[in-house]
DNA sequence: CACCGTGATGACACTGAGTATTGTCAATAC
DNA sequence: GTATTGACAATACTCAGTGTCATCACGGTG
């Protein structure tokens, strides 16, 4: 259409003004004026000034939630990696906007706080999903918490690297690497299929003393009480 | 002294009023009036309404920072666990206040956001410290990010459990368990001392097929590229 | 064509957080 | 005794966010 949606015009006006004049210096009136609507209309589309910077977070969160829920215990790991890829893909799709927002968020504490809060919402989602997946196994809550935190941290690390590099390279190989790392690290979280068919690998240095071997074994056993 | 510090009176008045009348329903004027000072005095002691709920976060953060900086690469793990214990100890010291705040934060989204932001600051601190510690090793940034996230997640999991239980039990054994778990999980993050003297443990199910063993080994190797 | 319901928008008023400025008073220094 | 400093109060201001009501465009209906 000739005139893009009001919602989109508002978001664009907001980011442009924040960029030009600074966040605190820009009033909602300014944004509404630039978008050619009234102040009240702004608040009809966005609950707050910050909201205009993160227009589609709720949608994305719902998408991730849906992807996680559309899986069984057998496909949990795939669901998690898929969900993370969805999020990253969302940033990559609109690299222009993502980069501008990244620079903006870096300069405005209020926006940084907002972003951190939304990251926490993803982490909570993953935690709940993984918690259900692991339910019944020992330390399920703890493990779910740790794995959710790691998954989200891995995503953020890759995303930040991509943003800092100016959104130039393809971030999915790094993401796969990072997620592979997380999954390998947490592989022993998976519930043993039938309790007897586990495969575990151990190697010993030929020069290792029996004491050193014992300590390694104790550490290993100590982590699964 | 007969009259406690104004700062303390303000914080107490704030939490009391938030408890009685709700957060949004309480104005800064109310808080100041209850503390027997003027509105402007409130803002002299706290930058915002939320600040009054988390009076000593900055101090605690500085303490943690100091503890981390007062360590070398050799003692990094001890420093991390110590730092986490400092934080938990701070909550336990004043269980009364911690519990009241926990209930309050659970009900007020604005406070929850604030708390999440301060958790992020701890995580950042740990990430930087661990990053320096691992500097030079492959994937140092990624590993630092993951371990910091896990350490913080472990702490929060234990803290939440303690708070939900009403602050009754001693949370340090659970913390040790959780941290032990994290450290065991990330043990292979430690840089090998001299590259040849590692001790690694591997066990195989007697019924495992050679293929299963090979897969396990490949997974193991895949996590250290 | 006149009428009517509906949904989007604007105009406006109000509350309250946070800031900045200025004034006042008391303690301490000199 | 006077000057300086610092803690607090008083006041006015900006602006985010909420709520209410009027207006206008519109599509359908009689």
Regions found by a protein language model. Give the residues of each.
Chain A
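Basic, helix-initiating cap at the start of DNA-binding domains
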Residues: 1-21, 25-37, 62
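C-terminal peripheral helix-coil segments that are non-catalytic and often amphipathic
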Residues: 164, 168-225
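Amphipathic alpha-helical packing segments from all-alpha helical-bundle domains
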Residues: 109-135, 142-150, 157
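DNA-binding alpha-helical recognition surfaces that contact promoter or target DNA
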Residues: 30, 44, 153
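Hydrophobic alpha-helical connector segments
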Residues: 62-103
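Hydrophobic alpha-helical segments that form the core
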Residues: 139-162, 172-188
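HTH DNA-binding helix-turn interface
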Residues: 21-23, 43-55
